[in-house]
Structure formats: C-alpha cells, structure tokens
C-alpha cells in the first residue's frame, strides 16, 4: 500500500511536483520516502527513512532542474525501514531507477541467479531485484525490455521506471496493484491514487491489470496484456482532495472494509505455491512442529478475537492443546510453558506493549515465539523467533477491519501448514480448505455489492442503547468481534455471549428496545440458535440475524444479514464483514466520526 507518483513535463519542476505529490499520499502510511529524477548527468536518487519531512530537509538547499522523475513512499514488506531499503532503487550501473508497490513472490530465485552473474545488490528488497533484472535484460527499447522482465517475475505490482537513455519518459505497468495516469497540458503524470496529482489534473485514466504505459510530456501510449495498443477511457474526477485521499469513499473504514477481497487474494497468492500448498518454510525456519505439544495465542482487542478464530482452526485441524489469552492477563495467569510450547503473538502495529511484555515473558520461560504482525521491522518482529507478516497494508481507521481478516487468514493458513507437516489433514480436505479462500474472496465481493441492505438495517437500530451479540461455537468468536465494532464507533453498550449462556443470567436484561444480533453459520446448531432467538423475541428484543444461506434464522428475526457459504471455517469470517458494515452504517447514521472514535488510539503502547 505504498504511494507512487511520476511526472514528465515541459517545466523543469519535477522535484517540486514529486515532493508535493508524496505529501498528498502520506495518509496511506509509510516508513520512508524517496524520489528519482533525470538530470544532465544521468539519474539522481534521494531518499530517507522516516517522515517525508526528513527527505525535504535533506533536499532543501538543492537546486535541481529536471523534467522527469518518479517518487515513492514505502510501507516495508521486504527489508527493514532504512535509507538503503527505501525506494527508488538503482540498477548496479545506475542506468535504471524503479519504484514498486506490491510483492515479488519469486524475487529470491532471481536474486540468486543475478548474484551468480556477479551483480552487486545494495538493499534487502524484492524491488531492487527487478531494477537489476531490467538492466540485465535491457535491449535498447523500454517496452520490449519490460515485457521480458514481466515474463520472469511473479507477484503483485505497480512499477514506474525511468532510464538514462530516455530522459523524457517513464514506462509503467500494473498487476493487482492500483496505478493511474493523469493527463495535463504539456505534462503527464502517473500515481497510485488521484490525491497525488489532483492539484495538476482531473483527467484520469485508470489502468487495467496487465497494462503497460509509456508516458512523455505530450503522449500517453497504453498497451494491454495482449501487447495491443489500446485507448483507455479518460474520466473526469470531481472529488476534492479529502475525498480523493480516501479513494472516493466517505471514510477510511469503509474503504478498508472493501479492500478485503484484494487482501484475501494477495495473502493466498503470496503464501501458497503454484500447487496451492502453503509455503511458510522460510517464515518458520527452525520450528519443529513434531516437538510442539501446546500452543498459546496471545493478543489484545481485535487481534485477540482473531486469535480466538485461530484457536478454533488449530484445535479442529491439529488435535493439539491450543489456548488463547488476553495479553494484559497472560503473565498473571501462570501459563504452563515449556520448551515444547509455541507461543503466537498477534499485533497489527507490532508495538502493542502488553503483547510485547507477554512475549518477553514467554521467551524467558523457554517457549518458541512466533509474531504475526502487519508492520515490518516493528519491535515484535525483531524480538520474536519467527515472523509471519499480514499483508493488509496501512490501516488508517482506528476500528480494525482488514487487519482482522488478514490475521485470521494467516492463522488459517498456519493451521493448514502445521496440519500438513504433521500429517493431520487428508489431501482432499486440504485442497478444499485452500479453495475455500478463493470462495471467501468471491463472496466478500458479493456482500459488498449488497451493502445497502445492511445500511437499511442500520437506520432502524441507530437509536438503540443496549445490545447482545449471540453465537454458538465459532460464531461466538464472531459475536465478540461484531460487538466490539459496535461499541468502538457507536458508543452503544453491547455484550457478546455464547447463545446458550444467555439464560444463565443475562436474559434478565432483555426487554423492548434491546438489540440482539444472532449469528448462525453452522447449520448443525441452527435450530438451537433459532430457539434462543424466540426466547429474546418473546421478551421484546429487536433481533438482527447474521447467517448463511440455508439457515432457519431469517424466518424468526426482524432483519437479516445473509451470506453465502464460504466453507465451514471461513463463512464466519464473511459474517464478520457483514457486522463491520452494520457497525459502520450505524455510526454513519448517528453522525459520529467513524475513523476516529473517542478515547481510542490505533496503537496502544502503554500498559
């Protein structure tokens, strides 16, 4: 989820345009920034770790005239945040400079090949591999060279490339990563999103997957995946900057909810091989699962609820004792830890202090530690024995949505990986579990298309003051996350309970005007959930069902969020997306600040 900008124009103000554009995409989150521009002496790169201000201060006394350049803000995925790992990247001969958003899956094998040919690398990134490969394959023509490069690499990407032999142009391409072209008067632009170039143009071409585009100040030439020159539609953008920074969405939260299909696909593509086997050998090097007899999953808030889903997966698939604990309590619960214990610590930011302290405690007791985090180079990833990164990209809204689903999906894949290592999962079942991930993505897309139905429900419940979220089995874990979302951004008191536990006290609180969200994705327990619904309906509750097709729940509730079957283990994840929408639209109707709810912080760094 990096920020990209490129410029080719008749005015020698490329550096100014690039720095201004990068400032406009700071909202996406980043850990370093850099630009490359063409001068009379060749290509010059300037880049700095940290905030864009560091780069600006570094360059404040520079006097540079340049008509072509590219700029980038980086969110690290390969190589920790440092000056040398920041983009852009040179080839060894400095004839090529390149920026990249995405992940190159087979970079290691290409890097090995280039090293054997004597190429010297100056960073730890997958991106530099592409710059070096482009230089090696260069045949004097930018387009034909790029096509040769693209045939060698696998992954998701948006590239912008400049070459010293063609000082007036950029060549760019995209594959499952956003890239647009902005059209101006004797100046043209490329960017990852509209906000970077809105000051200069509102005429935008949205490139499609497989497109390659050559950009000069006066010409834009687009080739499609079949290498045919095509004319893409030019669209007039009517957004203002604030809207553009959110990609046209009203809030970051709904934008991030709707990025989940892309994240599901990316996670599947990056963490499975061509045969769709989970490939965590590198991430889990040194961990012998035959020696593990107990697993702990430790986290806070939404990450903890993702951990509950992970616990369910592992207990069902592995037959190993798996425990979850809240990080602030873990050290004080006297967990039984030996050198046969695997302790998994989940933190979006990688800086959650309770989780860090719990990991320190587990290491001291002899546990093998695994971090699951969204931020490369964060404290938790440096201190754990092993790390698996979620691929959610920066999450701006305080209420977590896409980070949750990416954490759950990583733990799902981890369960399959361990199960395969231990011989616990039959091949036909393994392939079904993997194929369910693609099914989940398709069904999230379908749910997004039906979101206005959930908006209509939100209009009816917006004035409710108290509520309960109920579920059985894995759905009780769904209830917890759904309840948290409603609390976080609506300030409605809600409580999540196992549905069968309601009658043991809490049913005394059910009366007219109380909201009950009843969740049922396991049809074996559907009739029991229906019975619980009838109990609360008889006492005046307004009941919203959240269930999969085939459930009896729609027959007995006031409103329903119905989702398609995405497999036994992943349908609950789809249901959570529906509950994210319910919380979002309720907050929208109440007029609250969806992205910045009161009293909450994105990263909790104090105990």
Regions of interest found by a model, annotated:
Residues 227, 542, 556, 566-607:
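Generic C-terminus detector
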Residues 71-84, 274-287, 310-346, 493-509:
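Glycine-rich oxoanion-binding loops at beta->alpha junctions
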Residues 8-11, 100, 120, 136-139, ...:
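Hydrophobic alpha-helical scaffolding
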Residues 287-439, 519-559, 564, 582, ...:
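Glycine-rich phosphate-binding loops that contact phosphosugars or nucleotide phosphates
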Residues 1-246, 250, 262-293, 305, ...:
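Conserved short alpha-helical segments that host acidic/polar catalytic motifs at enzyme active sites
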Residues 68, 96, 294-296, 342, ...:
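Structural motif
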Residues 260-264, 268-296, 386-515, 588-607:
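Active-site phosphate/pyrophosphate-binding segments
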């Amino acid at each position: 989820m990096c920020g990209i900008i490129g410029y080719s124009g008749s005015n020698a103000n490329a550096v100014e345009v690039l720095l201004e554009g990068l400032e406009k995409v700071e909202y996406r989150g980043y850990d370093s920034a850099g630009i490359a521009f063409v001068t009379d002496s060749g290509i010059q790169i300037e880049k700095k770790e940290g905030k864009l201000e560091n780069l600006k201060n570094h360059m404040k006394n520079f006097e540079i005239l340049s008509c072509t350049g590219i700029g980038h803000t980086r969110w690290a995925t390969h190589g920790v945040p440092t000056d040398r790992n920041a983009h852009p990247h040179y080839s060894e001969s400095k004839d090529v400079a390149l920026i990249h958003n995405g992940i190159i899956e087979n970079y290691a094998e290409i890097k090995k090949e280039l090293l054997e040919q004597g190429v010297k690398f100056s960073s730890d990134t997958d991106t530099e591999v592409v710059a070096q490969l482009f230089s090696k394959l260069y045949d004097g023509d930018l387009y034909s060279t790029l096509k040769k490069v693209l045939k060698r690499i696998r992954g998701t990407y948006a590239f912008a490339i400049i070459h010293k032999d063609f000082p007036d142009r950029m060549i760019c391409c995209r594959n499952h990563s956003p890239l647009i072209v902005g059209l101006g008067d004797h100046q043209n632009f490329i960017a990852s999103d509209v906000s970077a170039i809105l000051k200069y143009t509102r005429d935008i071409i949205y490139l499609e997957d497989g497109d390659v585009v050559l950009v000069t100040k006066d010409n834009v030439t687009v080739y499609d995946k079949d290498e045919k020159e095509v004319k893409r539609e030019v669209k007039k953008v009517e957004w203002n900057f604030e809207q553009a920074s959110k990609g046209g969405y009203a809030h970051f939260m709904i934008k991030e909810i709707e990025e989940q299909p892309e994240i599901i696909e990316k996670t599947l593509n990056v963490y499975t091989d061509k045969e769709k086997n989970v490939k965590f050998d590198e991430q889990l090097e040194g961990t012998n699962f035959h020696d593990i007899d107990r697993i702990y999953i430790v986290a806070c808030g939404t990450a903890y609820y993702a951990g509950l889903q992970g616990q369910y997966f592992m207990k069902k698939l592995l037959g190993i004792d798996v425990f979850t604990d809240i990080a602030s309590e873990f050290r004080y619960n006297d967990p039984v830890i030996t050198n046969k214990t695997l302790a998994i610590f989940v933190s979006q930011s990688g800086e959650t202090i309770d989780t860090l302290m719990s990991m320190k405690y587990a290491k001291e007791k002899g546990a093998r530690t695994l971090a699951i985090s969204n931020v490369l180079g964060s404290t938790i990833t440096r201190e754990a024995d092993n790390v698996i990164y979620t691929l959610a990209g920066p999450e701006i809204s305080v209420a977590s949505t896409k980070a949750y689903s990416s954490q759950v999906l990583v733990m799902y894949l981890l369960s399959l990986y361990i199960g395969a290592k231990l011989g616990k999962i039959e091949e036909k079942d393994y392939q079904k579990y993997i194929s369910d991930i693609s099914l989940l993505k398709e069904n999230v897309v379908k749910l997004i298309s039906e979101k206005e139905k959930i908006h209509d429900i939100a209009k009816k419940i917006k004035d409710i003051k108290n509520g309960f979220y109920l579920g059985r089995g894995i759905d009780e874990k769904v209830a917890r996350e759904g309840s948290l979302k409603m609390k976080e951004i609506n300030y409605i008191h809600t409580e999540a309970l196992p549905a069968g536990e309601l009658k043991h006290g809490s049913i005394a609180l059910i009366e007219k005007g109380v909201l009950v969200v009843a969740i049922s994705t396991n049809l074996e327990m559907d009739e029991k959930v229906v019975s619980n619904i009838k109990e609360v309906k008889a006492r005046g509750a307004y009941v919203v069902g959240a269930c999969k097709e085939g459930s009896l729940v729609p027959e007995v509730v006031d409103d329903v969020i119905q989702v398609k079957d995405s497999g036994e283990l992943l349908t609950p994840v789809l249901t959570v997306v529906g509950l994210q929408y319910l919380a979002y639209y309720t907050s929208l109707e109440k007029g609250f600040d969806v992205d910045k709810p009161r009293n909450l912080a994105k990263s909790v760094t104090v105990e």
